[in-house]
Regions:
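Feature captures the catalytic ectodomains and active-site-proximal regions of enzymes
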Residues: 1-339
């Protein structure tokens, strides 16, 4: 289901009534049970392995680890896994692999390697493996580092596919280069722009891409939500933003939530998306780009919506099924398994 249903509409959101900017990685923000929880409640064995720990608590919500039917841990904090909280312990000894560096291919390879081992030894009914997009943020397709990553990924997909399982491979978003010809980040700092246009009024720009992993993207993405202190200025602000050539889409909250299935109470008064090679920032002073060692690659806009959707069933032609969303992965995996 889309975020209008489950409530998670980004890494980060803002509550105007309290003035709080909050990471959305706590299960309290979930508005529905997870697929894993519902299958677990029906007696299924579940395995969830994430690269970043920020996802683990969300995806593991509702699982119980005292019945030997659930395993949920991250490679980032694999050394902290316990039977009580994760359904597994001494992960690094078990996998014979140390805790990987967060900003590396190794973080994702740990997930895939553990997934193959868990499939063989634990035989879960449902397994979910979530890698990190660090390599995609840093290296364009065809770069030797990117090729090395996909070679590794393909190796483990092959090992998984040797088993009698239904397998779906997809992504949460695409990725595009967001730099000028000199290799410097292309960014529109919308909060600065609005302060210049409306010096007596306050606007808050929130970038849902924001998370602690600033080396990936410097908190610059192609999607932004804007909160207006003075609601009467929303229409005027929309018209001003539409004059920025590098902003591709500007919508009111109501329009954006209807088109993109977002939760209204966690969305800004204005929703913006930048053009293919640009990102959006809040204020120039808030973005520390010193950690970006490679040319910026990021996501969040209309040009990063297309993602791969790969299945391992020769009996299903998904190209004839019309629009498919990445969240349909479990539907098709279950459909293939039933056949």
């Amino acid at each position: 289901q889309p975020s209008a249903v489950h409530g998670i509409c980004g890494n980060f959101f803002y509550t105007p009534s309290t003035g709080e900017e909050v990471m959305m990685n706590d299960p309290q923000y979930l508005r529905t049970p997870t697929i894993f929880q519902k299958f677990y409640e029906q007696g299924a064995k579940i395995a969830v392995i994430t690269a970043k720990d920020k996802l683990r608590s969300l995806l593991g919500n509702g699982l119980k680890f005292d019945e030997n039917r659930a395993i949920c841990f991250s490679s980032e904090k694999s050394d902290q896994a316990t039977l009580e909280l994760n359904g597994i312990e001494k992960v690094n000894d078990w996998l014979q692999t140390p805790v990987p560096e967060v900003y590396s291919q190794d973080l994702s390879e740990f997930v895939m390697k553990a997934g193959v081992k868990i499939l063989n030894e634990y035989q879960p009914d449902i397994m979910y493996l979530s890698t990190t997009d660090f390599i995609q943020h840093k290296y364009e397709p065809g770069h030797e580092v990117a090729n090395k990553f996909y070679s590794m990924f393909d190796h483990y997909i092959g090992l998984l596919n040797e088993k009698d399982i239904s397998l779906v491979v997809t992504a949460d978003h695409g990725m595009k280069a967001k730099t000028n010809t000199s290799g410097e980040p292309n960014a529109i700092f919308l909060e600065d722009f609005l302060k210049e246009k409306f010096p007596q009024d306050n606007f808050k720009v929130i970038l849902p891409i924001t998370d602690p992993y600033v080396v990936h993207h410097g908190s610059l993405g192609s999607f932004a939500m804007i909160y207006a202190e003075n609601q009467e200025l929303i229409s005027k602000a929309i018209e001003e933003i539409k004059n920025i050539p590098e902003i591709e889409e500007v919508l009111s909250k109501q329009e954006a939530c209807k088109i993109y299935h977002l939760p209204e109470d966690r969305s800004g008064d204005i929703v913006c998306m930048s053009s293919e090679s640009f990102t959006i920032g809040s204020t120039k002073s808030k973005h520390d780009l010193s950690s970006l060692k490679e040319p910026l690659r990021s996501h969040g806009g209309l040009h990063e919506r297309e993602v791969p959707f790969i299945i391992n069933s020769p009996n299903m032609d998904i190209t004839t099924l019309g629009q498919i969303y990445n969240y349909d992965a479990f539907y098709y995996a279950a459909h293939m398994a039933n056949k």
